[in-house]
Amino acid sequence: MNPAPGSSIIMIHPSRFSVPLFEILQGKYSYVKGQTLHSSLRNPGVFSRQLFVHLYKRALSRCTYDEVLSDWQLFEAGIRARWRGSRYESGAFKASTFQSWVDTVKMTLDQLLLNNIYHILHTRTNLSYERYVDWVVAVGLVPLFVSKPDRALVKSITSKFSADSVGFSSDKYKTMKTVLMTFKRELTSVLETVTSIYIPDFSEVQLYFDGSTTAYFGVYRGQRITVEVVNRPIIFNGEVTFDSPVQRLFNTVMSCHRTAEHAKLCQLLNTSPMKAVVGSTSNNLYKDILNHLEQSSHKSDPKREMLQLLIKLAENKTVSGITDVVEDFVTDVSQNIVDRNKLFGGGGGGPSAESTAQGLKKQVSGTVFKCLTNQINEQFDTIHKLEKERDMMLRKVHTLETHLSQCRAEDKRLGEVSITSSLLTTDTLKSLLNIHDSSLSLHAASVNKGDNVHNSFFSQYVPPFREVSQDLTSLWESEVFETFKLTPVIDNQGQRLYVKYSQDTVSVLLGPFTYVITKMYEMELITDVYSSLSLNEIADGLYKSSRLYVYMQDVGAKYNLESQEYFDAASAASAAAPAAGRTQSPSAFSQQAQHGPP
């Protein structure tokens, strides 16, 4: 879809404003160390942990006290039947029995939920958290293509969680059956959502802004799709400025890239060997040659005479001047010529007989004029060929100008307003051409003999691109840290090991993805503590804060006081763990980071 001329619809993407931003994220321009923070930012493990927390909490939230009590009574009766004659009422027996039940319930939950959720989180679906982060960081807009859920995938996964398949078909294990059915229903809802939403890649979609409705929409495979606005861009005079980190870094990134490109050009130019031939541009150079010949030999030298003739012919531009040169040459040479007719007689002997000097003059003049005539004819042929080439080049230039006019008209029709190019961000070779066309262009100048020439281009100059890269690294880190509030995890030496989501990062980045993109309104955002813990650690914390654990604690308290003491100690330990996680300093997190984030 292309906007019609005069339409209020403006193409936002792809354009010269948006495509370079995604190319920067892909490392096409000046990929520096600080940009690796973006890889941590787009880590899909954070959303996977949130899905895990949601599924695990929901699975344990539907069980009832009666179901827990019924399962406990059934378990306790089975223990009594197997250990007849034992001291059923002893504290040790009761504590051992209840502890066995608690541990087996936990192991069953891990086998039923933990292992299967691991498998689900690694199932390939349409929804991509990484592409969502790329769109937010680049342009602040997220296109969404909503289709029908993948029923085949949903059925293949949820079929594994029927009561019959896991051995809960009888009236026993009421608690586990409730957990299983609740988990299956919630899993079905989540899978239908994540298989029906697709975030296209930046090369697959076009984004537009409708000025009449002030709304954004996209086109994906010929279909109109929704565009969610996370950070609204600014459109002014046909130019689009995105409210995004990469937009703010764009000029600095391109400046660093062009500086490195300039350094590469200097390296290539300075690597090749260079030689300079120094000589005088004076027109009196041939006179120096004649003086040298005269000084080297005082005798008459035919080569010197011929060279002198050629030089004098080159100096004269008129026919009369050339005639005078020939006459002077013949006069000088004839002084050394013996006229055979005068000496021996004969040869006609009449007054009209041609002398040797006259014959020489006639022959030299004829030869010279013949050479000049041939040269003039060659010049006319060359001029004729050049005229033909000129006509051909004019036709080519006219054709190129016609194509250029058509391209400019097409750009204007698409709403592309011409803007002044920046010397820092445009192509280096084009920038050099612009410099040569400007008033700063170099001009030729004559250099007097004996003077020295100082030209900086002959020095091994390389722009300081390393310092620029270091500055860009610091700017990347500052922009990402301040925009998304990431938390660095450092060791005792002050070295950063990795970064993790803070609570502000969860709210700023994961919140819109959960509630605006996927529209999972019943899902709670995870805390920053869970963003870097392993799934086993998260499962332990969720289990000890669940409704099931509270009911089991109450049953144990009423069954045996010793079990109550056990639960009190476990509760104190579980309460201390999250508190320690919330108050832990970055250096303390280094103990968890020895193997990196999970």
Swiss-Prot record:
Q: Does the keyword Coiled coil apply?
A: yes
Supply the alphabetized keyword list.
Answer: Coiled coil, Host nucleus, Viral genome packaging, Viral release from host cell, Virion
Q: Name one GO biological process term.
A: chromosome organization
Residues making up the signal peptide according to the UniProt record? none
Ubl conjugation in keyword set: no
Q: One of this protein's Pfam families, by short name? A: Herpes_UL6
**Which locations, inside or outside the cell, does it occupy?**
Virion; Host nucleus
Q: Name one GO cellular component term.
A: host cell nucleus
Principal localization?
virion
Q: What family does the database annotate? A: Belongs to the herpesviridae portal protein family.
Q: What does this protein do?
A: Forms a portal in the viral capsid through which viral DNA is translocated during DNA packaging. Assembles as a dodecamer at a single fivefold axe of the T=16 icosahedric capsid. Binds to the molecular motor that translocates the viral DNA, termed terminase.
Q: What does the record note on quaternary structure?
A: Homododecamerizes. Interacts with terminase subunits TRM1 and TRM3.
What is the name attached to this protein's record?
Portal protein
| Protein source organism | Equine herpesvirus 2 (strain 86/87)
